[in-house]
Amino acid sequence: MKKNNFGKNFAESIYSSSSKKNSQKFSLDETASPLGLRRQDIFQSSEKVSQIRLVFYYITAFAIFAIFCLRLIHLQVIKGEDFSLKSENNRVKIDNLYAPRGEIKDRNGTVLARNDAVYRLVKENESRLVSVETGQKLIEQNEAFLDKEGPLGRLFEDTIRVYPKGEAFAHILGYTGEITADDLGNDSNSYLTGDRIGKMGVEQSFENLLKGKHGKKLYEVDSTRMEERIIGVEDPKIGGSLELTIDAELQIKLFEELKKEIEKAKVTSGSAVAQDPKTGEILAMVSYPSFDNNIFSNRIEGDAFSDLVNNPDNPLFNRAISGIYPPGSVYKIVSSLVGLESGKITPETRFVDEGEIFLGPFKFTNWFWTQYGRKEEGELDVSRAIARSNDIFFYRLGMAVGEKELQLGSREYGLGEKTGIVLNGENAGLVPDEEWKLRVKNEPWYPGNTLQMAIGQSDLLVTPLQVANFTSASAIDGILHRPKIARFVSFSDGRVEEIDLASEIRKVNARPEWLALVREGLKQACLTGGTGYPFFNFKIPVGCKTGTAEFAETEETHAWFTVFAPFDAPSITLTVLVERGGEGSAVAAPVARNTLEWYFSSIR
């Protein structure tokens, strides 16, 4: 029994000893942390960290979910209407329907500017015109071009400007060109990308009447963006149809005659204006050289435009209203009336031509004596002086009247100011005076300047239109008109409005007897013994004046001729200028003679 107890006790003793050792070991481990922490504290700390991380994960997940929900609410509730509209816009489309410009016609209904059908190829914010042939080929390749925007864009029906009468009308009609940002200004709502607007001439001056009002088409498209259903259409409205004062046949005839004489004289340029002296209406206005304004109807190629701009003869320049030249002897119409108005000469005044006069050391001669060796023409009154274009008479007139009277009188007859024609680019010309000469040339006004001005020289500069205008005033009761270029505009709704109303600028201060005296001189100028020899034996009486104007320091001269007819009841004034043409009677007068002979013929 003791043995068994010993074994038991020994085992218990061993176990007890082992337990104590383990207990001691555990106790040592719990106190063995280098930080002085017990293992139990470490386990508890680790559990806390895990809990914090878990909470962070929960919060992060919740935040992400909350953001997602808020975004969903924003898109569906707040922005839902916008997206709905965008979706609708992707389904509903608006096309612009291009409105054609109004036609331009002459006073007899002849079409001078019309519209021919073309297509406009539009892609995004760009557009260009293509011919009907090109458009039809595209449609043949894919009919959807008219109902759907493809890789090349979409085709719309449009028109292109056509000028059927050629270069005779280029300066007066002008042309159209693609609109620019500068052109738009504050009127951007009236135009579309690629629109063409007037850039010159009547096309530019009457842009607001000629341009149409674009329409719109609202329609639905299917998933392939093919037109499915038309919702509504606002039809485009064509622009107003403009009737000009121009006589197309006269315009063409005058251009042909001017061109013929310019080529015959072997010079390069000139212009002519025909006017109704009773109303101021312009019947014809030509400038040479000219250009084909049809080339501007589509995008002009760089080389073609460069050729026009760099041409030394400047075919784009409208010489009738923008060119300024010394008037030479055609100005004697004005200086005669100014002299009579001043009282320094009268219908009874006679000056003796002895071939030359002296002003100090300076000699002034009569052109006839200088040119033909004749020394004198004897005694002349104002009518005979006009008929003979006698320089000596007008030198003496200038000495009697003085520069201030000539300057004031010139302005009274519309010189030195624009006539007011509604075409852009008109030049006012120049009536020189003391202040101008001192400022520009740094010279005083000399007495010789007055003599030169009296015969249309010195620094006096005029346009052909101004000469036509004062010729008309001398022909009809001294009334100076603002030239009129257009008469009526007709709209698609049937309305017809009178436009560009001609108005009197003023009635010049000339008594009827003075005007009669000057007109008598103009009548004699076209009869035997006068200077307008191409009109000798003309079938109807006319009044005319020649001019041969010196310029620069060369011996070249500009050729002038101005005439009104019939003499007793004038219905037309015609003024012709041939630059560097020589004598007015030799070069410019034949243009007028041939044109008026045709104009008054029974064939027309």
Regions found by a protein language model. Give the residues of each.
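Beta-lactam-recognizing serine transpeptidase/beta-lactamase-like catalytic domain environment
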Residues: 5-6, 34-35, 113, 221-233, ...
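Periplasmic/cell-envelope proteins involved in peptidoglycan metabolism and beta-lactam response
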Residues: 1-302, 324, 344, 349-352, ...
